[in-house]
Structure formats: structure tokens, C-alpha cells
């Protein structure tokens, strides 16, 4: 799979342009913007301190959490679509990857962002949209059987690169595999709680 990262035809200037565009799109902290606009203060001061949809949900506003999830996904998709139109498909993959990085490490708020599940999905939507259906199916299956949201996302992110590789989309598979590893690192606290049996389940109170 790693050999496919060396077989790209994209030029360095185009790759850099795609990376910058993607990173700037991904750095938009929608969770923080929406909660402040709604008069709910700084989402970083509650729960996990994360700017993603899961932490926004801890404000008690489901609409804002859903909007955050949607916008965090669409910023990666938009970066990929815009770059694909002007710079080509390989550049779009790079833009999606760096939108993911931008969400995790946003320049505007001290490089402290979310865990990247929504932007992972958004990148898929931008470069391999049919895989979003598989991601959703795996997430729902695991969530239904275990009621762990974090585990559902982790399993889905593990399945996606394998499925892409089997289907012959090896460049996207390689990039998504790297994104999966990074997201696993960002989820290390969740993984520790899952292993210890202390991770919160979907619908759990308190």
C-alpha cells in the first residue's frame, strides 16, 4: 500500500496548493463558532474540551451538534471538490487529507482541534463517496451491537482502507489508512476506556 504513495503523478506546486487549501478549510472550527453564536460559550471549556460534534452535544443542544457534524464533514468534502475541479483528482485526495489534519490541528485556535471522525467521513464523500455508505453501515452495525459510538467509528475507520484496497482504489486506500492511524492516536483515551470497560455507551446518562 505504501508503494502507491510513491506512484503519484502530481507536481510539488500543485500538491502544496492542495495541502494549503485543504488545511485552511479543515481548520475552520465550526463547533466553536456555532456554540459561541448560540450563546453557549466556549465548547472547549466543557466535557473533553474537544471542538467536535460529540462534545458540542454535551451542551445539550442536539441541533447544534448535528450542524457541527455536518459542517465538519462538508468542509473536507468541499476542499476535495474545489481542488478536484481546479487541480485534479490526486490533488483532491491531498486536500481531503489536509482538511482532516486541519480539523485535528486548527491554526486559528492553537492547533487544538477535534478527533477527526466527521472530517474523515467528509474526505470519503469528496474522493470515494460510495465508501460513506459502507462507513455508515459498519458504524450502525457496531453501534447496534455494542452501543459504543467511539468503537463504532474506530471499526469503520479500520474497514474503509481495506475495502478501498480490495476495490483497487489503492491511492485513496493508502491515504485513508494513514488517516485511520492518526485518528486512532487521537482516540487513545477512548481506546483506553474501552479496554477498561469505562467508555460511555450511546444513551447512557451521567
From Swiss-Prot:
Pathway: Lipid metabolism; phospholipid metabolism
Topology in membrane: Multi-pass membrane protein
Keyword hit for rRNA processing: no
Keywords: Cell inner membrane, Cell membrane, Lipid biosynthesis, Lipid metabolism, Membrane, Phospholipid biosynthesis, Phospholipid metabolism, Transferase, Transmembrane, Transmembrane helix
Catalyses which reaction(s): an acyl phosphate + sn-glycerol 3-phosphate = a 1-acyl-sn-glycero-3-phosphate + phosphate
GO terms (BP aspect): phospholipid biosynthetic process
Protein name: Glycerol-3-phosphate acyltransferase 1
Species in which this protein is naturally found: Rhizobium johnstonii (strain DSM 114642 / LMG 32736 / 3841) (Rhizobium leguminosarum bv. viciae)
Gene from which this protein is expressed: plsY1
Amino acid at each position: 500500500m505504501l508503494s502507491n504513495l510513491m506512484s503519484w503523478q502530481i507536481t510539488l506546486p500543485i500538491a502544496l496548493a492542495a495541502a494549503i487549501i485543504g488545511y485552511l478549510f479543515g481548520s475552520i472550527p465550526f463547533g466553536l463558532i456555532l456554540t459561541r453564536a448560540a450563546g453557549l460559550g466556549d465548547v472547549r471549556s466543557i466535557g473533553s474540551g474537544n471542538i467536535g460534534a460529540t462534545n458540542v452535544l454535551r451542551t445539550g443542544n442536539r441541533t447544534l451538534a448535528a450542524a457541527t457534524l455536518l459542517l465538519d464533514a462538508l468542509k473536507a468534502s468541499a476542499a476535495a471538490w474545489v481542488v478536484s475541479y481546479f487541480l485534479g483528482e490526486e490533488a483532491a485526495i491531498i486536500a481531503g487529507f489536509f482538511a482532516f489534519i486541519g480539523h485535528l490541528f486548527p491554526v486559528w485556535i492553537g492547533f487544538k482541534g477535534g478527533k477527526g471522525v466527521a472530517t474523515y467521513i467528509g474526505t470519503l464523500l469528496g474522493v470515494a463517496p460510495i465508501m460513506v455508505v459502507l462507513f455508515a453501515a459498519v458504524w450502525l452495525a457496531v453501534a447496534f451491537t455494542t452501543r459504543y459510538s467511539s468503537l463504532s467509528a474506530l471499526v469503520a475507520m479500520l474497514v474503509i482502507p481495506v475495502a478501498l484496497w480490495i476495490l483497487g482504489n489503492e491511492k485513496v486506500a493508502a491515504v485513508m489508512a494513514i488517516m485511520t492511524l492518526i485518528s486512532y492516536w487521537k482516540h487513545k483515551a477512548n481506546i483506553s476506556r474501552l479496554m477498561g470497560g469505562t467508555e460511555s455507551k450511546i444513551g447512557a446518562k451521567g
